[in-house]
């Protein structure tokens, strides 16, 4: 058998299975490679072995070689340590973005090239086009499944060596293809959540690595409402898991996280889902990454997402001298969260993005610039 020109990242899911099937149907010399990115920690919840068996089965049906690589060490140092540091600092990271940049489109690409392949293919809902002398990252045709948000840190060399075979497909059509092709993953449930946590309780998992420290939950006026198990378990806008019972003199309505003071170990909540304390029209980012290697201009208009699957929000972007971004939105944004990814778009094209550093939300701004009085908001 000739050396495969393309190595497909087979995850054991239906998306990568159909990606491999499409390339095989095109007569492309391919092989499959399964990446183990998380070592079994003894919890009994690691899904990697089941996924690996499914990946082997798919490669068997397609009649293509199967390879295995353990990238758990690279994942730990390149993704998980950053994940823990961000949570410890009170921010909410996005490990999927780092996993794509540091593992799937770095170590996997290198492993494929070491096997003699020219490029890799994955089951991401995204598209690549070569326009104007540059490689462009485009949204997937299925807007509900589009994964360009998680791929915005990719660059020219990575896109030049990457295929997204299912980028033009709708999920419903992909399922039908998988069933008609007899792929053993055709009915497999889509994976959700953070890959290394799986179905486990998030607090229990995080508590293994970050010692919990209980503290006060306060309302915006500084009144003690309840007690929390650790501020890093919560993110802005969150409702679930606060376990705030009836509070004397307060309506029987849900509470929402509106601020975190990691230094004083205080969590701030409000009963208004759209509290003014959660609203921001401006954000500052860390250093930005541009898919084509450079921004469109020093100042330009585009649309942005500050969380996955968020509707596009019109904004104006100003590139600072140090490469960071100042972004002004046309209308207020709810719960823009430091540590999450800001991703910028021009129509179908993903321009790039950056990690959100700060916003002008009233409570966040006051917490960042004061010594934390007992009454945070007058």
From Swiss-Prot:
Question: One MF term from GO for this chain?
Answer: ATP binding
Q: What does the UniProt keyword field contain?
A: ATP-binding, Cytoplasm, Disulfide bond, Nucleotide-binding, RNA-binding, Transferase, tRNA processing, tRNA-binding
Outline the segment boundaries, as ranges, of region: Interaction with tRNA.
145-147, 307-308
Gene3D superfamilies registered for this protein in UniProt: Adenine nucleotide alpha hydrolases-like domains (2.30.30.280), HUPs (3.40.50.620), Translation factors (2.40.30.10)
The positions flagged as active site in the entry are 99 (nucleophile), 195 (cysteine persulfide intermediate)
The protein's matches in Pfam families, at most eight in alphabetical order, are given as: tRNA_Me_trans (PF03054), tRNA_Me_trans_C (PF20258), tRNA_Me_trans_M (PF20259)
Compartment(s) where it occurs, according to its Swiss-Prot or TrEMBL record: Cytoplasm
Q: Name one GO biological process term.
A: tRNA wobble position uridine thiolation
E.C. number? 2.8.1.13
Coarse class of the protein's main subcellular location: cytoplasm
Catalysis: reaction(s): S-sulfanyl-L-cysteinyl-[protein] + uridine(34) in tRNA + AH2 + ATP = 2-thiouridine(34) in tRNA + L-cysteinyl-[protein] + A + AMP + diphosphate + H(+)
Cystine bridges: which residues? Answer: 99-195
Span list, region Interaction with target base in tRNA: 94-96
- The feature of type site (Interaction with tRNA) is located at 124, 340
> Which family is this protein grouped under?
Belongs to the MnmA/TRMU family.
Its biological purpose is as follows: Catalyzes the 2-thiolation of uridine at the wobble position (U34) of tRNA, leading to the formation of s(2)U34.
| The protein's name | tRNA-specific 2-thiouridylase MnmA
Q: Name the source organism.
A: Xanthomonas campestris pv. campestris (strain ATCC 33913 / DSM 3586 / NCPPB 528 / LMG 568 / P 25)
